[in-house]
């Protein structure tokens, strides 16, 4: 999804890769899956089996903005979601000692990667990546969204914010109605300015 593209009705995923790390990862993944990979210079093509073509045919949304097919995040088993997450990080992410990041010009895909993290028991925050504001060769003029993957402090806490140590409950004067939301799986997930709360 990160580096690949496909045309409508095509049975081939096409890549243009230069980095040895990405090339090695693509080769290893195709070998593990038993999928055919061909190469011509920097151009690679993967023959996608018929049962996977619907999945890969849905990665380009409006205006060529990459997205995950909507049903993907709710139908894939956890091992497949883990593979998807690893693939996204290999394509457009970076793994650092302080945490993983994923960069994309697709705001929709950034939100979907954040949702993917939730399904994997992780958390993620989205921000506009300052490091790409002065860029010469990548992403064109689209804004870049950076998804910061959070692997620590995943235990839910009430009223947790910077400077809240020791203050978890208080009484607030209020006049007006209070509404309760109920959802089928008892998890309400809300995002405000790229920050998730559930």
Predicted regions located by residue number:
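Intein-associated homing endonuclease modules of the LAGLIDADG/DOD-type, together
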Residues: 1-133, 165-198
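C-terminal edge-of-domain segments
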Residues: 145-151
């Amino acid at each position: 999804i990160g580096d690949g593209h496909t045309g409508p009705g095509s049975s081939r995923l096409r890549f243009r890769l230069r980095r040895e790390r990405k090339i090695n990862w693509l080769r290893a993944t195709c070998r593990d899956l038993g999928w055919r990979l061909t190469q011509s210079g920097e151009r690679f093509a993967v023959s996608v089996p018929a049962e996977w073509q619907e999945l890969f045919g849905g990665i380009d949304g409006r205006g060529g903005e990459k997205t995950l097919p909507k049903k993907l995040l709710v139908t894939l088993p956890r091992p497949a979601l883990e593979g998807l997450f690893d693939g996204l990080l290999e394509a457009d992410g970076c793994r650092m000692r302080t945490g993983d990041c994923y960069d994309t010009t697709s705001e929709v895909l950034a939100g979907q990667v954040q949702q993917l993290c939730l399904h994997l028991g992780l958390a993620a925050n989205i921000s506009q990546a300052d490091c790409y504001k002065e860029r010469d060769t990548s992403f064109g003029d689209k804004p870049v969204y950076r998804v910061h993957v959070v692997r620590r402090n995943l235990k839910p806490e009430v009223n947790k914010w910077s400077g809240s140590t020791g203050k978890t409950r208080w009484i607030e004067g209020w006049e007006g109605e209070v509404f309760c939301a109920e959802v089928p799986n008892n998890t309400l997930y809300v995002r405000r300015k790229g920050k998730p709360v559930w």
